[in-house]
């Protein structure tokens, strides 16, 4: 069987973490099997679909390294084909017009609720006579079109993740609506389950890989495949992604879209790595820190868990820090320089920038951390409480005055690590203090705090701007 899989997002919002994980599993499976990964934009919700969301989906997938193999299919462009299929189902007796009003349906559901029953359409208009239909038309009622689902029908399939699955027709909510209300003999807007079957068949999809929240839809869609005498694809239902409280991850949990993760400073490699781990167990001997192109060679649904996956911020942060620490200084600078420019910061030289990221990179978890850590090199910082306390000791002023006088006799462009160390030794001897006192006082004067990356390297970088002289002189 030629493997053809698809991602079918609805452009009613930005690319969600769960949708991106589904895309990743589809892509990995296609790569493993030498198949084709396709993209279909399900934009039939005209009121909520937006062009900006379509672009966000495209951009998010590309950023993650998930590229599709053929031009995207736009679902709304196939609406005439969808309506023709609905007409065929009606003509063959698999579907019918239902004239029940919304008020009648609400009353039906309320009655069922009072009797302790689950809401379910009671199929009241399944067998209307022509005379009954005429009466409803005279009343001005516009019908929906429903597909017949027998309560006695058992629907089974072999799920690649969950094994043998069986649903009973009586648990599917009664005859399902496949087209919205429309006047006369016209067919209303086709609905989800119908158009998915129509498009998956037209695209020759061999495997449908999606979240477990689609299990009931799969049962309904299999009935449509059978009625239309179409080949039924193989199904795989991935586990849900839960928040820390064990509830389905939603917008209420804060960041859920790929574009938001990107803005926060997460790397595409770490995101793809982490999303693969959300539901997939790493085979023995494989490190959890990997590249998705490597995983595509070993990916298997046998290692995808049935149980839901909990989102773990600590794990994602660890992976992101690993990716950053593995970056070359050139790559890290490429990521950071646009952020520096946004803040109005300009590098005195490329070499200076390379040295800066080499200094701050090891302590970064997010790309955006580089902005905070680089800020003291571009902008003078307010004194922290511990910095103020250090500069209030009587020796501090003497130390800083000595260092400033020595700096005045040196060339900023040639200031080096060796010269910095020598100057600290001179200050220690001349001021008759411990080296630690000199270094703490100097750090507080230069950076406003007693904490930070290596002081000597930091000082050498700052000296390229001659900012060390300016900052010390303001404190004396």
Curated annotation (Swiss-Prot):
The EC number of this protein is: 6.1.1.17
Return the protein name: Glutamate--tRNA ligase
Question: Which ranges form a coiled coil?
Answer: none
Q: Does the keyword Protein biosynthesis apply?
A: yes
The EC class name is ligase
Task: Name the SUPFAM superfamilies for this protein.
Answer: An anticodon-binding domain of class I aminoacyl-tRNA synthetases, Nucleotidylyl transferase
User: What GO molecular function annotation could you give as one example from this UniProt entry?
Assistant: ATP binding
Q: Which UniProt keywords apply?
A: Aminoacyl-tRNA synthetase, ATP-binding, Cytoplasm, Ligase, Nucleotide-binding, Protein biosynthesis
UniProt xrefs under InterPro entries: aa-tRNA-synth_I_cd-bd, aa-tRNA-synth_I_codon-bd_sub2, aa-tRNA-synth_I_CS, aa_tRNA-synth_I_cd-bd_sf, Glu-tRNA-ligase_bac/mito, Glu-tRNA-synth_I_codon-bd_sub1, Glu/Gln-tRNA-synth, Glu/Gln-tRNA-synth_Ib_cat-dom
The family database entries (HAMAP family) matched by this protein are listed as: Glu_tRNA_synth_type1
Family to which this protein belongs: Belongs to the class-I aminoacyl-tRNA synthetase family. Glutamate--tRNA ligase type 1 subfamily.
Q: Which cysteines are joined by disulfide bonds?
A: none
């Amino acid at each position: 069987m030629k493997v053809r899989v698809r991602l079918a997002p609805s452009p009613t919002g930005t690319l969600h973490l769960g949708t991106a994980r589904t895309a990743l599993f589809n892509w990995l499976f296609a790569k493993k099997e030498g198949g084709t990964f396709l993209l279909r934009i399900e934009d039939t919700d005209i009121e909520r679909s937006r062009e900006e969301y379509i672009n966000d989906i495209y951009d998010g997938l590309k950023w993650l390294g998930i590229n599709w193999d053929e031009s995207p299919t736009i679902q709304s462009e196939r609406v005439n084909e969808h309506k023709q299929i609905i007409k065929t189902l009606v003509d063959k007796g698999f579907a019918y017009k239902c004239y029940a009003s919304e008020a009648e349906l609400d009353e039906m559901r309320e009655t069922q609720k009072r009797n302790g029953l689950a809401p379910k359409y009671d199929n009241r208009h399944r067998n209307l006579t022509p005379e009954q239909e005429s009466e409803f038309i005279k009343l001005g009622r516009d019908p929906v079109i429903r597909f017949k689902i027998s309560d006695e029908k058992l629907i089974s399939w072999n799920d690649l993740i969950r094994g043998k699955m069986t649903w009973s027709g009586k648990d599917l909510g009664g005859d399902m609506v496949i087209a919205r209300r429309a006047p006369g003999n016209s067919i209303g807007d086709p609905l989800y389950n119908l158009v998915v079957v129509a498009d998956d068949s037209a695209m020759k999809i061999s495997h449908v890989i999606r979240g477990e929240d689609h299990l009931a839809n799969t049962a309904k869609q299999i009935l449509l495949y059978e009625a239309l005498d179409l080949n039924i694809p193989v199904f795989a239902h991935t586990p849900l992604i839960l928040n820390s409280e064990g509830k389905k991850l939603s917008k209420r949990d804060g960041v859920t879209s790929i574009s938001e993760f990107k803005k926060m400073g997460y790397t595409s490699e770490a995101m793809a790595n982490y999303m693969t781990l959300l539901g997939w167990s790493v085979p023995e001997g494989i490190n959890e820190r990997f590249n998705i192109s490597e995983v595509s060679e070993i990916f298997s649904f046998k290692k995808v868990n049935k149980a839901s996956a909990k989102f773990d911020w600590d794990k994602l942060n660890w992976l992101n820090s690993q990716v950053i620490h593995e970056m070359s200084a050139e790559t890290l600078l490429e990521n950071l320089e646009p952020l520096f420019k946004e803040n109005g910061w300009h590098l005195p030289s490329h070499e200076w920038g390379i040295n800066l990221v080499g200094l701050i990179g090891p302590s970064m978890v997010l790309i955006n951390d580089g902005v905070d850590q680089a800020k003291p090199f571009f902008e003078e910082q307010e004194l922290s409480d511990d910095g103020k306390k250090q500069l209030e000791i009587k020796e501090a002023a003497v130390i800083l005055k000595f260092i400033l006088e020595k700096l005045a006799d040196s060339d900023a462009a040639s200031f080096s690590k060796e010269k910095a160390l020598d100057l600290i030794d001179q200050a220690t001897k001349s001021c008759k203090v411990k080296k630690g006192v000199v270094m703490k006082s100097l750090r507080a004067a230069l950076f406003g705090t007693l904490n930070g990356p290596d002081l000597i390297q930091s000082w050498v970088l700052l000296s390229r701007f001659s900012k060390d002289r300016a900052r010390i002189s303001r404190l004396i």
